[in-house]
Amino acid sequence: MLRNNPLPHADVLRRRDPLLRHRSVDEPELMDDPACDPVALDNTYRLFGVINPLVASWRPVYRRYVRPALRAAAREGRPGTVLDIGCGGGDVARAITRWAARDGLDVRITGIDPDARATRWAAAHDRGVGAAYRTLASHDLVAAGERYDAVISNHMLHHLTREELSAVLADSRRLTRGVAVHNDLRRSRAAWLLYWVATLPLARARVFVRFDGLLSIRRSYRPGELRQALPPGWRAVQQRFFRLLAVHTGQDAEAVQADRDQVDTPQKDRTQSDPGRTS
């Protein structure tokens, strides 16, 4: 997989705003290009299964938010259902299915992505999990009247414009009967520098992981920014390891709250003391 390639060096991300005061919303990620290198894209989807468990911290999110919703469904005598919006290569859907099985919970997971390249790859690498992958957008499921016990996404929010963010969050509220939790990066200089060092061995690899990952950090929110962008009913929850969640628990989810584990309790929003905060 390592070879010379025409991908731009990650150092170009330091040309502007080196202190990460502002979101880099105008810089596109390479893998979002419909004409991007298909080999690099395939390699990137494959590496997501290695990198996301290390950087996305989904296990505590599953324990605190998703598992209680699945247990509530089990008490009603039915399988729990999870919708993964923007599922990419399906690594999060596969992980949640495995964790639920270990917890003795029956779960049906649907992964959706408007990019057919993602859903094709996810379906081809499902590894017997049995998740359903569909090439469509969240508003299509709203129109179909579908509902799920938990609606999730991974590293999606920073890709969206303000209008798209509002639309996806509105769809998430309509689609969940329990909890909606969107797990994303939290922008900071420390996160950027750590990722720059950690992915240095991939600097000349035929993958998008390094360039797009560094850009994703620059595009992501700080807690105060996300709070201002969220509509009523949503809250920004700061997590360890440079993570930031957008969480909604509706009326149907109130009973779920009591079943939450005391695992990785979200920190208070410490925007003022964020080590990456400069303004």
Regions found by a protein language model. Give the residues of each.
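A conserved beta-strand element that flanks and buttresses the S-adenosyl-L-methionine
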Residues: 152
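A short, conserved alpha-helix within the catalytic core of class I
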Residues: 160-171
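C-terminal alpha-helical "lid/dimerization" subdomain adjacent to the S-adenosyl-L-methionine
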Residues: 185-229
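Conserved Class I S-adenosyl-L-methionine
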Residues: 219, 223-250, 279
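N-terminal, positively charged/glycine-rich alpha-helical extensions of SAM-dependent methyltransferases
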Residues: 1-47
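Class I SAM-dependent methyltransferase SAM/SAH-binding core
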Residues: 83, 89-91, 96-140
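Class I SAM-dependent methyltransferase Rossmann-like catalytic core
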Residues: 38-64, 69, 73
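Conserved beta-strand signature within the Rossmann-like core of class I S-adenosyl-L-methionine
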Residues: 176-185
